[in-house]
């Protein structure tokens, strides 16, 4: 004990001052994760996003959350007298000095605490190469840490900051990168391989497996060593590293611009998010012969405006990085419900009013505008109910002639649709959805049909419900929703049996846009 105190005093004298070591909380704050996490409404992790590309630092793990196998292996093979020394293993140091004097290959004498001092102060990491003073500085820093932290805290900090492979720092990052799992789930073999990486983070698979085999105390030709070689090859070989990060909402994560270490709870539901992604994949797989490659899904809670699912694209699509929820597309027939709601509200039409579905040519300053139905057929006189449910184009244009272009344009703005042009720019094509809008702006107005005509902002994050305002008359909203749920009225275009005919009450509307 007296020798240790004297040596520490000498080291401090050489440096003029000992300084103060940080506590565990300070260490943790100084090393935030390189990722951020997006959580669903229940706290489940939906998306892990790397936002700091200077390093790969895993989320800080409490010692109890790190595999005991890894803890034991690191202590045994990196610092076997960790529990007994005060930061510097004088026996190991003396042995290393003796080997050096004899010209033999020197064994490492740095303890876990000394290595941790190097992680915290990179200038100390190469203390051995900076001569006696450099080594004394590293030893003094280790003693300061021992006085400040408990042994479990030192081990926790070490396992969270140690460089294992490449840019992966900490057991969490290394476990995820190499084995596709959390640090708590490491097996004995995986713990041995991670420990074997500590003295040689760049080791080739064969070298790594050989060291892990020696740690295991098994002969090179044993089944245990063969298993370690296979595992090392799989984990370390370029291009073979596994990834265990959550990846259910990449587009939403990109939209929210997360900061390192952030854990943001959203209004989404992970189960519904996965279900929506699977439904999109299933639907698109049936449309491959029609050259449909991608799509998006947005699910909003009608009452609260909370976003329940946000799928920006199909996984593996050529442009999967594009967020289809925010991409601009022509609205198509999805604007028709709001046109008819306006006409009904102003008592220009009722659900039973007849409209003529026959060829029409409208004179405009740009020439003749001649709308066509999707199937290029005409059905003669039809009711408003049939025209809207069957998404007929010509009756919609005739309805716009009755309401006027400017009033309908104003109604769309009131509903929150960010139209880029004035009413005259779109002309009568406004009835058929000529404006470009995104799915986020288009979906929210449909909530008004379920909320008595009231419109409020949709949201992604928990909080009080947004204030709403009346835009559509309640009776008009009810009538339009009833029409959109009318399977019989819809059959004029879609038939009685089609994907829109659900087993429960649902108001649905299709829309087609052009590329």
Where are these predicted regions, by residue range?
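N-terminal type II signal-anchor transmembrane helix
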Residues: 1-41, 81, 224, 228
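A penicillin-recognizing enzyme superfamily signal
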Residues: 19, 266-289, 297-301, 310, ...
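A short, well-structured edge-of-sheet supersecondary motif
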Residues: 35-48, 66, 290-317, 410, ...
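Short active-site loop at a secondary-structure junction
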Residues: 57-66, 290-295, 318-338, 346, ...
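Active-site SXXK
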Residues: 72-75, 79, 276, 304-305, ...
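Short, well-structured active-site flanking segments
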Residues: 83-93, 170-172, 223, 318-321, ...
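Conserved catalytic neighborhood of penicillin-recognizing serine enzymes
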Residues: 99-126, 238, 242, 349-408, ...
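Non-catalytic, structured segments within soluble enzyme domains
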Residues: 105, 109-274, 410-423, 428-433, ...
């Amino acid at each position: 004990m007296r020798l240790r105190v004297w040596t520490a005093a000498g080291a401090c004298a050489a440096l003029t001052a000992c300084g103060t070591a940080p506590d565990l909380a300070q260490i943790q704050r100084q090393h935030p994760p390189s990722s951020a996490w997006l959580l669903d409404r229940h706290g489940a992790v939906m998306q892990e996003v790397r936002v700091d590309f200077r390093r790969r630092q895993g989320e800080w793990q409490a010692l109890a959350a790190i595999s005991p196998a890894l803890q034991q292996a690191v202590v045994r093979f990196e610092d076997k007298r960790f529990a007994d020394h005060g930061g510097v293993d004088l026996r190991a140091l003396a042995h290393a000095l003796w080997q050096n004097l004899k010209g033999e290959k020197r064994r490492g004498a740095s303890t876990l605490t000394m290595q941790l001092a190097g992680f915290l102060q990179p200038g100390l990491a190469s203390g051995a190469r900076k001569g006696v003073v450099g080594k004394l500085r590293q030893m003094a820093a280790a003693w300061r840490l021992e006085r400040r932290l408990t042994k479990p805290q030192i081990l926790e900090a070490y396992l969270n900051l140690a460089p294992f492979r490449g840019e992966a720092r900490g057991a969490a990052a290394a476990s995820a990168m190499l084995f596709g799992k959390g640090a708590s789930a490491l097996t004995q073999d995986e713990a041995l391989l991670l420990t074997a990486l500590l003295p040689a983070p760049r080791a080739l698979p064969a070298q790594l497996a050989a060291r892990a085999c020696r740690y295991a105390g098994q002969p090179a030709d044993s089944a245990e060593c063969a298993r370690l070689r296979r595992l090392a090859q799989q984990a370390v070989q370029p291009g073979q590293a596994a990834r265990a990060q959550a990846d259910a909402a990449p587009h939403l994560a990109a939209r929210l611009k997360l900061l390192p270490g952030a854990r943001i709870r959203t209004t989404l539901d992970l189960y519904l998010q996965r279900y929506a992604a699977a439904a999109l994949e299933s639907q698109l797989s049936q449309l491959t012969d029609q050259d449909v490659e991608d799509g998006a899904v947005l699910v909003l809670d009608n009452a609260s405006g909370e976003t329940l699912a946000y799928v920006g694209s199909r996984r593996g699509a050529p442009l999967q990085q594009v967020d289809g929820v925010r991409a601009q597309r022509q609205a198509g027939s999805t604007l028709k419900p709001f046109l008819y709601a306006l006409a009904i509200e102003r008592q220009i039409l009722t659900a039973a009013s007849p409209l003529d579905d026959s060829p029409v040519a409208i004179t405009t300053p740009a020439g003749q505008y001649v709308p066509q139905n999707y199937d290029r057929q005409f059905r003669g006189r039809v009711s408003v109910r049939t025209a809207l449910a069957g998404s007929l184009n010509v009756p919609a244009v005739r309805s716009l002639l009755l309401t006027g272009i400017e009033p309908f344009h104003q109604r769309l703005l009131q509903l929150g649709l960010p139209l880029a042009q004035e009413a005259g720019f779109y002309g009568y094509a406004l009835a058929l959805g000529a404006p470009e809008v995104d799915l986020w702006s288009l979906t929210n107005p449909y909530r008004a049909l379920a909320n008595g005509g009231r419109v409020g902002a949709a949201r992604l994050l928990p909080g009080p419900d947004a204030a709403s305002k009346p835009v559509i008359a309640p009776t008009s909203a009810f009538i339009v929703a009833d029409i959109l749920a009318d399977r019989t009225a819809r059959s004029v275009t879609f038939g009685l049996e089609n994907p829109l005919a659900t087993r429960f009450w649902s108001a649905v509307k299709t829309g087609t846009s052009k590329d």
